[in-house]
Amino acid sequence: RWWLGTPLDAREPWRAGSTLADLAGVVDEGTRARLALTRGPRAAIQATRPAPPARMPDTVRVATANLLNYYNGDGRGGGFPTERGAADAAALQRQHDKLVAMLAGLDADVLALMELENDGNGADSALATLLDALNAVPASAGAWRAIDTGPLPYGSDGIRVAMAYRVDRVMPQGAPAWPEAGESAALNRRPLAQAFVPRDGGEPLV
C-alpha cells in the first residue's frame, strides 16, 4: 500500500483500471506473482469514473445487484457471526452502508437482488432491513416495496434472490412466478419472475 501515497480507504477507493507509472521490480518466483519493488512509482493515476447513463423518458430502469451475502443477524442487532455474511455488527454496518449508497445511486425503478439472506420477508428479515434503509433515503420518498414470496424461506439455500420496486413508478402485474419444487429445489437459489407496468402507462415488462 505504501506506493499509493495514502492508505487504502473505503471512502476513496482505487478504481479498477487505475495505474502506477514508472514502476520497477522483480517478480516473485512463487505462485502468487508478487512484485518485489526495487523502485517506487513516479505517480499513481486514478481511473476516471464513467458518467452514469442518462435516464431516458418513457423507460423503466431495471438494475441488478449482487449483495455479497447480505445477512443482518437476527435483525435486532444480534445473531452474529452469521452463516456466510458479516462476522459482527460493525462489519454488517460497513456492508450495509455501502450497499444502500450503491443501490440508491442507481436510481432504479425495479431492483433484482442476489445473495440476500434467505430468512423470509418479515420485519426482522434482511430484505426488510435493506428496504427500510432505502426508504429512509430522501430521494426514495418511502416508495420501495418488496415482491412478496411469503413468510417462509425462498428455496432451500442459505441465500436467495429477491425483487423490489418503486410504487410511485411501476406496479406489479399479476402474481410473482417461480419454478415448482422438484429436482432443482435442493440447495438451489430459486429463480423469481414478476411482470410490471409503468405507472404513467406503457408496455408491461417481465
Enumerate the predicted regions with their spans:
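Divalent cation-coordinating acidic motifs and surrounding scaffolds
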Residues: 3, 7-9, 13-19, 31-206
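OB-fold and OB-like beta-barrel modules that bind single-stranded nucleic acids
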Residues: 20-28
